[in-house]
Curated annotation (Swiss-Prot):
Subunit (UniProt): F-type ATPases have 2 components, CF(1) - the catalytic core - and CF(0) - the membrane proton channel. CF(1) has five subunits: alpha(3), beta(3), gamma(1), delta(1), epsilon(1). CF(0) has four main subunits: a, b, b' and c.
Function: Key component of the proton channel; it plays a direct role in the translocation of protons across the membrane.
Designated name of the protein: ATP synthase subunit a, chloroplastic
Family, similarity comment: Belongs to the ATPase A chain family.
Disulphide bridges: none
Residue ranges crossing the lipid bilayer per the database entry: 37-57, 96-116, 135-155, 200-220, 221-241
GO molecular-function terms, A-Z: proton-transporting ATP synthase activity, rotational mechanism
Membrane topology: Multi-pass membrane protein
Organism of derivation: Marchantia polymorpha (Common liverwort)
CDD domains: ATP-synt_Fo_a_6
GO cellular component terms attached to this protein's record: chloroplast thylakoid membrane; plasma membrane; proton-transporting ATP synthase complex
Pfam families: ATP-synt_A
Length: 248
């Protein structure tokens, strides 16, 4: 076998190994586009859960809240207080739906990965997992945060918003621009890494000791999942508030 053939064989082996590590995915073909079906399926399920809970809790509203209505009002009050704390008393109200949607979607997605056995459902390729277990979802959430960040600043300050990029000196222009994109992206990688690591640890422990040991880790995963949703929503609100205030 020639030296070139050996090198080609080596590269093929590395390629096969990378395929095993990355895993397989299930796609839908829509025209010339491939849609990542695994993420869409689980995301739609999470959205359906949120909509169902909202309808059930608010279909019979009372002046004095009880039961599900009381719980929903508590959650909304928590989200409102979080948004007001980070954005400010004068500007927070229009951003409560955005921050609330972000928090609830991430929270339910994270908990679905910790509580629901997605992998029992077989697909032609790949396997189901929590939406936030996929980097595509977390990066999409980061991009939404970036769009909200720029919109808030432009809506509040107009074109003068871009003046912050040359403060305190124009030399920092590239760094200031890069910072606005890296902050939301750091959120996405943190969320993705924590949720993926939690599911992998629980899966490994269940395969080794299937009865007792994984239970504490599952409770720890639930706690971590809630904290990650809170961190993402809090920092997203803080970035939006920062863009309207115009300081770093």
């Amino acid at each position: 076998m020639s030296h070139t053939a050996k090198m080609a064989s080596t590269f093929n082996n590395f390629y096969e190994i990378s395929n095993v590590e990355v895993g397989q995915h299930f796609y839908w073909q829509l025209g010339s586009f491939q849609v990542h079906a695994q993420v869409l399926i689980t995301s739609w399920i999470v959205i359906a859960i949120l909509l169902s809970l909202a309808v059930l809790a608010t279909r019979n509203l009372q002046t004095i809240p009880m039961g599900g209505q009381n719980f929903v009002e508590y959650v909304l009050e928590f989200i409102r207080d979080l948004t007001r704390t980070q954005i400010g008393e004068e500007e927070y109200r229009p951003w409560v739906p955005f921050i609330g949607t972000m928090f609830l979607f991430i929270f339910v997605s994270n908990w679905s990965g910790a509580l629901f056995p997605w992998r029992v459902f077989e697909l032609p390729n790949g396997e189901l997992a929590a939406p936030t277990n996929d980097i595509n979802t977390t990066v999409a959430l980061a991009l939404l945060t970036s769009v909200a960040y720029f919109y808030a600043g432009l809506h509040k300050k107009g074109l003068s918003y871009f003046g912050k990029y040359i403060q305190p000196t124009p030399v920092l222009l590239p760094i200031n621009i890069l910072e606005d994109f890296t902050k939301p992206l750091s959120l996405s990688f943190r969320l993705f890494g924590n949720i993926l690591a939690d599911e992998l640890v629980v899966a490994v422990l269940i395969s080794l000791v299937p009865l007792v040991v994984p239970i504490p880790m599952m409770f720890l995963g639930l706690f971590t999942s809630a904290i990650q949703a809170l961190i993402f929503a809090t920092l997203a609100a803080a970035y939006i508030g920062e863009s309207m205030e115009g300081h770093h």
